[in-house]
Amino acid sequence: MLLTAFYVVLGSFAAPCQQDGDHIVTCQVNKCETVGLFEICTECKTGGVPVDGFCRPFGSIQAAAAGCTKADGTALDKTATTCGKCGDGYFLFMGGCYKTESQPGSEICTTASNGLCTACKVDSQYIFQNKATPSEKGSECILCWDTTDRNGVMGVANCATCTAPASSTGPATCTECMAGTYKKSDTECAACHSDCATCSGEANNQCTSCETGKYLKSNQCVEKNTCNTNHYPDDTSMTCVACTVLDANCATCSFDSATAKGKCLTCNSNKIPRTTLDGTSTCVENSYAGCQGADNELFMKEDQSACLLCGDTKEASNDKGVANCRTCTKNANDSPPTCTACLDGYFLERGSCTTTCADNCATCSEATTEDKCKICKAGFFLASPGEGKCISCSDTNNGGIDGCAECTKEPAGPLKCTKCKPNRKPAGTSDNYTCTEKTCEDPTVCGGTSGACDAIVIDANGKEHYYCSYCGETNKFPIDGLCTDNKGTNAGCTDHTCSYCAAGFFLYMGGCYKIDTVPGSYMCSKSTTAGVCDTPNANNRFFVVPKAISAEQSVLACGNPLGTIAGGNAYVGVEGCSQCTAPDARADGGMAVATCTACEDGKKPGKSGTGCVACPDANCKSCTMDDVCEECADGFSLDNGKCVSSGTNKSGLSTGAIAGISVAAIVVVGGLVGFLCWWFICRGKAQ
């Protein structure tokens, strides 16, 4: 998920898991924690343990690799929810095992030994080193806001950043408090006034930002209608802004939602307001020159009461501007403004901008003629130098770049992509992108930044495709993975998502999918009349979730380790798994994992089917960790995690070779004995 130098603490100790996060299914209620930019789980549902912040099945490859065991070193069992001890290369922290070499572990600890952290990452400022010798293993690093007493050492409630206690015991020294609180002392973060989102003190006039719906004015949070007279309510910053911020001579003002800027309405000192096309508002001299300015975008009314935009046609007679005009001149009374340049897409002809250029042209030499464009609108480029037709940046049939949204082209240079379409992933430099595979099958990316495209569907060839899980527009919802306002028979689809589906459909990641239409057919081949999948696709890349009802997701990808909830139980796939069988149903609110039967990327399932590992030895049936075999093929036996021929001893010689050597040795020894007998007996008689 791109880090910055400063990490904002988003959570508090023992916090609820984020609803759209990675742990809502597998983590116990209120057992999530946010460390830097990462949400981690500190206690999993029964049958799972935290490894690098994620809940993994107790018998998984990840748990084995981390050396996760009970505190006494004995093996985990199906009742496990946390790790009590970690192996080499990992350290114990808040019930989980973490690596120092990768995130989120690297944001907690820099050096570890024997399964414990020996040097915490204190420069992050949200964690400190326990100077005492903790009796509870895993308490070597403490979060600033963790108030659990660990041998007399603890954090400070609601503290965001801190340093270790001055002595070996006591609370941390808080340097900054969380939102909604302020630093009352080095060891106390006190609550702000209820009006404030953030504050510098407890009073209602010590706010630094406000709760939703209120505006900050003179350090107090007020209603929008009180931002009046010499202030305007800025809907972007949620503050009451003084008119003098726009210009020292601005007397009254308002907020222009079209430009998201303040607009001066009246000025002092005999000046008049001037607001340009981009929304910049100032007070200028009451003169033709003052209104015209350096950009020539405005002209003065003949009664000298206001500056008007060149394209403003609301006034009458000589004060009427020219429709679609960008710049103009007006030097005296008794004459209307003269347009000198039109807005993009309009052609200036005999002082008028009423005739448009051809489609996609910003400026042109002839109106409506497509090959007379001089400058193209954003998203298009000139087909030939000088002037010509404007071609879409993504039109590959005419020299465009696949997936490109905006581009540039020098007269003698190649076409370069500067921005990819929302559903494409950019690669390369920002002035010459290659727009790689789709990040979302919906061209709108499910409504842009307010939508989500997290529904992963695996096709018949094993390729992942991303479909809509949440639609940004309130009147749309995901049907067959794309946002639409046509729900058909799916009455359970309302604003943004679907909560249940009709017969012939099934619910998957917030959307309804048909069983006989791609992409739904990749996942399910048969569903009940209640809209529940009961038979997965024959490719076994998905499994049916046991005992799911219509309001629950009834199918899950074999490789989805984040899982889904059905009947209060967590059902998860296996990371890297391509084919699997469904787990048995649970009834205790715990975690059940699919049994993996085939893996991606040349890996093999472990013997238990709960993990995929690199297992390159052709004579090994399954590995417990990368390159560590746990079961060999017939004719081979285990020797320190490797498979050796059952007819081979540790010297590397086969039994046949050993037998041959033995026979040869017997012959040699027999010959030697015979020779000695002859020597001592026969030679003795001869003498």
UniProtKB/Swiss-Prot annotation:
Keyword Signal attached: yes
Entry PTM: O-glycosylated. The major glycan is a trisaccharide with Glc at the reducing terminus.
Location(s), subcellular: Cell membrane
Signal peptide: 1-14
Protein name: Variant-specific surface protein VSP4A1
Lineage: Eukaryota, Metamonada, Diplomonadida, Hexamitidae, Giardiinae
UniProt organism field: Giardia intestinalis (Giardia lamblia)
Main location: membrane
One Pfam family per UniProt: VSP
UniProt entry keywords in alphabetical sequence: Cell membrane, Glycoprotein, Lipoprotein, Membrane, Palmitate, Repeat, Signal, Transmembrane, Transmembrane helix
